[in-house]
From Swiss-Prot:
This protein's record includes keyword Transmembrane helix: no
Gene Ontology cellular component annotations, sorted alphabetically: mitochondrion
UniProt keyword annotations, A-Z: Isomerase, Metal-binding, NAD, NADP, Nucleotide-binding, Potassium
Protein name listed in UniProt: NAD(P)H-hydrate epimerase
Needed cofactors: K(+)
Lineage: Eukaryota, Amoebozoa, Evosea, Archamoebae, Mastigamoebida
Leader sequence segment: none
One Pfam family this sequence matches: YjeF_N
Keyword set includes Cell division: no
Length: 223
């Protein structure tokens, strides 16, 4: 399995949206659906995992979380989106409106963390530490819980190339790497999936990426 540096991950996204004409909207939709599929696979409703908290950051990773929340609601989960630092980006605001129209709570404060699973969609591969402000307090509280955590692309607060940092998410049970895994999760010991199947075959071959999907799979376990 090949692991991407931060620079490689950024250039990959640029090429997807440049030469291959993907929009950010498309990438978020495909990524968010993949995350939702991982949640249903690892924490199915029939095993008592109905209440899911989606913790969203202000950037694109948070957008993936918003999309994930919409799909999980369609799949029958009781979803709450915790979005303490909302972006004014037009597309992200549209994603919020979609949730609100479908009566999916989007909140900026939480009085309880009593959920069956938490989706960590705060910081992605563009993050450069350290963790500051409200998210430092949120991560500290989440790290004290025993609720399963599913991280999107990389556990929030980790260095994209060096891995775990003290003020980030300390315990990630399930990780879904988008496009290709990042260098900072090379030694990740939890359940690891690959998702976000939007890399054209030509680009895959050019970058020598190993993407072990079979036929019509949108997610695949890689450990």
């Amino acid at each position: 399995m090949q692991y991407l540096t931060q620079e490689q991950a950024i250039k990959l996204d640029e090429e997807l949206m440049g030469k291959y004409k993907y929009s950010l909207v498309q990438l978020m939709e495909i990524a968010g659906l993949a995350v939702a599929q991982v949640v249903t696979k690892e924490y199915p409703i029939e095993k008592g995992n109905k209440r899911v908290l989606i913790l969203c950051g202000p950037g694109n990773n948070g957008g993936d979380g918003l999309v994930c929340g919409r799909y999980l609601s369609l799949f029958g989960y009781e979803v709450t989106v915790f979005y303490p630092k909302q972006s004014k980006n037009e597309h992200l605001q549209l994603l919020i409106k979609q949730l609100e129209i479908q009566d999916i709570p989007v909140v900026t404060e939480l009085s309880s963390f009593e959920y069956d699973a938490i989706v960590d969609a705060v910081f992605g591969f563009s993050f450069k530490g350290p963790v500051r402000g409200i998210f430092k307090d949120i991560f500290s509280h989440i790290n004290s819980l025993k609720v399963p955590i599913i991280s999107v692309d990389i556990p929030s607060g980790w260095d994209v190339e060096q891995g775990y940092l003290q003020d980030g998410i300390q315990r990630c049970d399930v990780l879904i790497s988008l496009s290709a895994p990042k260098l900072g999760v090379k030694n990740f010991k939890g359940i690891h999936y690959l998702g976000g199947r939007f890399i054209p075959l030509e680009l895959k071959d050019k970058l020598h990426l190993i993407l072990p999907y079979k036929e019509n799979e949108l997610i695949v376990k890689i450990n």
